[in-house]
């Protein structure tokens, strides 16, 4: 097969190039990215990986069991014999030596043999060289000496002959000396070579030890951090072998007993064996390669508008109990399914050391509201001012507006007071003005606040004969909070008791100064009855509007605010919308708070149908999916399907947030709720004609609650009283209250059959007063003790039947037989009980009047003395009021 590069091989095996190069290096092969890989190198790498991962691990031990059964005939008494089975068992264990261990041992033996052979060869070689060198030196010396002697002998005249044996002995001695020197040199050289060989062997052993230690360390790291399945398989095999050995030993010990029992017991023994096998010990749990993190893990927790405790725990990767414990430390008791608001969840997550990312889940809402027709946004045109008339009740707000509109609105109001926000537009000679008429009663605070929010100018109506009142002050506060200019209309100037200076003085105490006194507020003096000063008031309004330079976009999609809403029986949900920009047309798709819909019809304040309405025009629209809340923003959008999605999303979010707040309120009021059983509850099902009145009545009724009687509005809504409302009232023992609405036919049947208390009202004063009287009837009555008579003991007689009888003179009031009494001695009560007998001249009587004598027997009391006083009293019930 052709050789391939490292990069291509990494692609084939599915690993990174760096990882493959690292594995080659661990196997002892140095490779670069562009180098080629041969088949032998592949095989070498494969062998290394198998060895590292333990894939080539095979059983190193094998146990063979042999069983031989023979029959032995044994004689018994009576000349008979019986056969006895003899079973011989043999067990042999064969151990397979590890190939690596054998190779290492052979390598060590070969190394030792090589070192010994090298040492012997070195010694023999050194010895032979020394002997040869000594022999050569001896021969050379002997030859030189012989030549010198021959020359000397030839040149000398007379030479003395010397014996040869001496010369040969000297040569031999010299040769022996040289030989010994050579041998010493050879031995020293051999010793040096031996020391070098030992040093080399020591270094090799150290190198091998270091290499084996490194391999052991890598194996341990691989088991700890490496592939979980590889390390687990090794441990599993080892554990399985150990368990098999234990089971086999245990089986050998118990086999004889089990076999005996099985012969005797049959089925029971079989069941015992099965039970034993069922509950036999299992190998210990295998270790895993996961290590518990020692450092705290910080996560980015994404939190929406609402989140449950379980969801928050999942996002933070902790148990829900940890969050519950953390919130208990923070002072809140929660459950696992409880909904938390965004702020609470953020506090908990940050307390537990995580980073919080707040999500904007209303992305669809922003997208829908951004996809609007912006045509002509730069083309601003003047618009009519929106004027809100505020003031105290009965100061003539509606009458003044009635004179301006030349109609009779005030006469048609129930009780002569305004209970709705009336929206009207008036054409004057100088331009159009839109008026919002707000209620003056204290219960309509929210309606006045909405009026100030949607307005450009506030007209504060103050009666010249009444001055500044609580709702006047509240209207001033609303105007200041909304940063709206204020024009003061001093009404009822036709009355003789009108006092302008008093009104100015009282208003100045609340920061409203007239221009005459150096202030910024215009004062107009008007009379709704005669029409005095009305034209000046309109001019002041238009002048203030010119100063404000009120402009709005006339073209494009409309946007406005819901002034009032109601549920009409024939028309369905009806909303009064004040257009603030754009043009509202019939057929537009409107997104209005939690509701949406296509405008089916539009009407002006007089009930006439219209097709479109521009800025600052109040209009009634029909076709919404439900009754919107007053104060909601009404916006025209393109797509009805997306408008429905946004409305449903808002409803879900509103429901979740409301639930979270209710739960929080319940937990915070836990101790207060413990005494709820002692508090009387007045349940009310309330229906009103418009949203504003419903809010006002609900708020006023809840303020009536006391420590002893609580007003509980179990259901409220806009529209007629239905059968569902009647059924709910009957089930909860509630009274039904209708404000300017009536019950339908089905509801009346249910009310009659269930005997539900139904009450209709058209004036809010009457409703509040009657609910207050109903609450008074639910108060527990007070009991008062009233003294009705006093008798003085003049003498004491003994009676065999009644014991001590007191002869008394009635000195005050009446003494009655049925009334309880007290016995007083020196004006201290010593006994309280009841009369047993009351007689006059031996006759039993029911009562004895002042100035008469009588005999009194006190029940269960005989210690009556002369001079004691007997006080007669009765307990009367006193009704309480709020």
From Swiss-Prot:
GO-annotated cellular components: cytosol
Region annotated G5, chain positions: 527-529
Keywords: Cytoplasm, GTP-binding, Initiation factor, Nucleotide-binding, Protein biosynthesis
Molecular functions per Gene Ontology: GTP binding; GTPase activity; guanosine tetraphosphate binding; translation initiation factor activity
Residue ranges, annotated region (G2): 416-420
tr-type G domain mapped to chain residues: 382-551
Compositional bias (Basic and acidic residues): 95-152, 161-202, 265-274
Region called G4, residue ranges: 491-494
Region described as Disordered: spans on this chain: 67-202, 223-278
Region (G3): 437-440
UniProt biased composition (Basic residues): 251-264
Stretch list, region G1: 391-398
Entry superkingdom: Bacteria
InterPro entries: DNA-bd_dom_put_sf (IPR009061), EF-G-like_DII (IPR053905), EFTu-like_2 (IPR004161), IF2_assoc_dom_bac (IPR013575), IF2_II (IPR044145), IF2_N (IPR006847), P-loop_NTPase (IPR027417), Small_GTP-bd (IPR005225)
Record: residues binding GTP: 391-398, 437-441, 491-494
Localization (cell): Cytoplasm
Keyword set includes Cytoplasm: yes
PROSITE patterns the record matches: G_TR_2 (PS51722), IF2 (PS01176)
Its biological purpose: One of the essential components for the initiation of protein synthesis. Protects formylmethionyl-tRNA from spontaneous hydrolysis and promotes its binding to the 30S ribosomal subunits. Also involved in the hydrolysis of GTP during the formation of the 70S ribosomal complex.
NCBIfam families: IF-2 (TIGR00487), small_GTP (TIGR00231)
Family: Belongs to the TRAFAC class translation factor GTPase superfamily. Classic translation factor GTPase family. IF-2 subfamily.
Protein name: Translation initiation factor IF-2
Organism: Shewanella amazonensis (strain ATCC BAA-1098 / SB2B)
